[in-house]
C-alpha cells in the first residue's frame, strides 16, 4: 500500500530548550516505507528518562524534541513488505526504532545493545531527519521495532510495560532468575520499582522492598504485595537481613552507597543497576570477592523479550498502577514526577487529548 499523502504534517508536544517545557509543535513524518507501520497514537507513558532528555541532563539533547517512548497505538497503514501487522492492530513502540542489523547484538536479537541503535526520539533516523516520540498524533516505525499488544490488554495499561516492565523482565530472564522460589530485593519504589515488585511476585519470588524510610511500607506490602519491607537506615534490620537475597534490582537514579545492599546478597548474588547515574559509585572489593557477588547492569530489553514480557503480564494479570492524564497536563506531570509524586506511572491519553490549544 502506498503512503496516505506525500507530506504528512502532524502535531506533537515538544520541548524547544533545556527548560523542558512542552508545547504544541507541528512537524512532518516520513512516508510509509515498504517495511514501515504508520501508527495513530492512543496512549503514551511518561518515564523519568523523558525528563533527563528534555532538560538536557545528559548533554545530548537536540530541539525541538517530542518525547515519549512507551507508545501504544493503532495501525493505520502498513508498507508493501510488512508481514507482521495489519490495519487495525493495536501495537506498541518502545525506546528503540532502529539498529544496524549487522553487529553481534543485532544478530543475537539483543538489538538494544547495538552501538548504532536509533532512539525513538532525540536521535537521527536513516533518512537524516530527527526522530520524534509518542507525545504526538502519529508515528511511522519500521516493523522490526513494533510489537503486538495482547488482546484484552488496555492501551493505557500496556504503555508502561514497554519500558518499566521490560526493564525488569529482561535481566531476570537473562541472568536465570525467572524460576519460582527465589528471594529478590527491589531498591527504590518508583515506576520501574513498582513493576519490579509485581513481575517478581508473578514469577513466584519472595520480594523484599528496600527503601530509605518507612513511608512506603504500607504501599509496598498492602498494595503491591511485597513480602517484606526493609529500611536501609535501620542498622539492626539490615544486619538481620544479611546474606538472604538472590538478587537486588537497584532502580535508584541518584548517587547512593552500594555496600549496604551488597551485604544483603547471598553467595553468587547479583546487584543489578538500572538507575541512570552520571557520577561514580563506590564499594570496597572484599564486599564482592568474599561472596562471589556481581555488580551488573541491564538496559531495557529486546523486541523478542518485549513480546514475551507482554504475554507474561497478560497471563499473570500483571498491571501497572497508573494515573491517566491529558496532554495539556504534561508539564505539571513532569514536575510531579521529579518529586516522586505519582503512583506509579503517568500515562497520557493522547487520542483523547486536544493537541492544539
Curated annotation (Swiss-Prot):
Binds 2 Zn(2+) ions per subunit. GO terms for biological process: lignin biosynthetic process. Pfam families: ADH_N (PF08240), ADH_zinc_N (PF00107). Its EC number is 1.1.1.195. Zn(2+) 1 binds at residues 47, 69-70, 163. It catalyses: (E)-cinnamyl alcohol + NADP(+) = (E)-cinnamaldehyde + NADPH + H(+); (E)-coniferol + NADP(+) = (E)-coniferaldehyde + NADPH + H(+); (E)-sinapyl alcohol + NADP(+) = (E)-sinapaldehyde + NADPH + H(+); (E)-4-coumaroyl alcohol + NADP(+) = (E)-4-coumaraldehyde + NADPH + H(+). Pathway: Aromatic compound metabolism; phenylpropanoid biosynthesis. GO terms for molecular function: cinnamyl-alcohol dehydrogenase activity; coniferyl-alcohol dehydrogenase activity; zinc ion binding. Belongs to the zinc-containing alcohol dehydrogenase family. Involved in lignin biosynthesis. Catalyzes the final step specific for the production of lignin monomers. Catalyzes the NADPH-dependent reduction of coniferaldehyde, 5-hydroxyconiferaldehyde, sinapaldehyde, 4-coumaraldehyde and caffeyl aldehyde to their respective alcohols. This is Probable cinnamyl alcohol dehydrogenase. It comes from Populus deltoides (Eastern poplar).
Amino acid at each position: 500500500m502506498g503512503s496516505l499523502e506525500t507530506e504528512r504534517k502532524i502535531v506533537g508536544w515538544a520541548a524547544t530548550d533545556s527548560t523542558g517545557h512542552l508545547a504544541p509543535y507541528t512537524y512532518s513524518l516520513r512516508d510509509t516505507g515498504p517495511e514501515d507501520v504508520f501508527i495513530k497514537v492512543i496512549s503514551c507513558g511518561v518515564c523519568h528518562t523523558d525528563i533527563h532528555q528534555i532538560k538536557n541532563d545528559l548533554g545530548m539533547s537536540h530541539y525541538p524534541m517530542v518525547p515519549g517512548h512507551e507508545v501504544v497505538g493503532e495501525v493505520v497503514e502498513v508498507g508493501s513488505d510488512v508481514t507482521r501487522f495489519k490495519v487495525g492492530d493495536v501495537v506498541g513502540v518502545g525506546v528503540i526504532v532502529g539498529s544496524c542489523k549487522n553487529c553481534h547484538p543485532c544478530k543475537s536479537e539483543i538489538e538494544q545493545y547495538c552501538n548504532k541503535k536509533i532512539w525513538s526520539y532525540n536521535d537521527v533516523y536513516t533518512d537524516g531527519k530527527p526522530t520524534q516520540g509518542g507525545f504526538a498524533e502519529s508515528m511511522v516505525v519500521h516493523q522490526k521495532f513494533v510489537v503486538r499488544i495482547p488482546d484484552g490488554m488496555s492501551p493505557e495499561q500496556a504503555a508502561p510495560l514497554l519500558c518499566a516492565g521490560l526493564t525488569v523482565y529482561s535481566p531476570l530472564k537473562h541472568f536465570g532468575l525467572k524460576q519460582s522460589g527465589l528471594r529478590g530485593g527491589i531498591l527504590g519504589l518508583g515506576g520501574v520499582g513498582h513493576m519490579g515488585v509485581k513481575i517478581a511476585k508473578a514469577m513466584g519470588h519472595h520480594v523484599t522492598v528496600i527503601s530509605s524510610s518507612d513511608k512506603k511500607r504500607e504501599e509496598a506490602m498492602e498494595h503491591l504485595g511485597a513480602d517484606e519491607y526493609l529500611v536501609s537506615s535501620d542498622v539492626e534490620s539490615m544486619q538481620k537481613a544479611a546474606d538472604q537475597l538472590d538478587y537486588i534490582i537497584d532502580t535508584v537514579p541518584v548517587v547512593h552507597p552500594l555496600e549496604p545492599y551488597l551485604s544483603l546478597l547471598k553467595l553468587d548474588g547479583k546487584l543489578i543497576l538500572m538507575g541512570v547515574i552520571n557520577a561514580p559509585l563506590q564499594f570496597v572489593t572484599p564486599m564482592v570477592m568474599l561472596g562471589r557477588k556481581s555488580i551488573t547492569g541491564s538496559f531495557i530489553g529486546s523486541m523478542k523479550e518485549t513480546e514475551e514480557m507482554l504475554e507474561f503480564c497478560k497471563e499473570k494479570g500483571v498491571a501497572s498502577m497508573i494515573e491517566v492524564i491529558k496532554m495539556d497536563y504534561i508539564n505539571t506531570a513532569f514536575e510531579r514526577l521529579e518529586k516522586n509524586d505519582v503512583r506509579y506511572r503517568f500515562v497520557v491519553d493522547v487520542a483523547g487529548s486536544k493537541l492544539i490549544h
